[in-house]
From Swiss-Prot:
Gene name linked to the record: rpmF
Keyword Ribonucleoprotein applies: yes
Keywords carried by this UniProt record: Ribonucleoprotein, Ribosomal protein
GO CC terms, sorted: large ribosomal subunit
Protein name stated in the entry: Large ribosomal subunit protein bL32
Length: 64
């Protein structure tokens, strides 16, 4: 088993952990539907940047 040569100081420990922080997800609002979605992802309704890009099951039911 590996054993450290000397005790790690709180400063050194903090420097090692400096990249471990979580960041909040970036959310956007679609201009057409007003739906909130992740950046660079389509909405649940199939819209991306205000345009319909994919046919969804819910929209197919509404059209029938």
């Amino acid at each position: 088993m590996a054993v450290q040569k000397s005790r790690v100081t709180p400063s050194r420990r903090g420097q090692r952990r400096s990249h471990d922080a979580l960041s909040a997800k970036q959310l956007s609002t679609d201009p057409t539907t007003g739906e909130v979605h992740l950046r660079h992802h389509i909405t649940a309704d199939g819209f991306y940047r205000g345009k319909k890009v994919i046919q969804t099951k819910t929209s197919a039911v509404e059209e029938d």
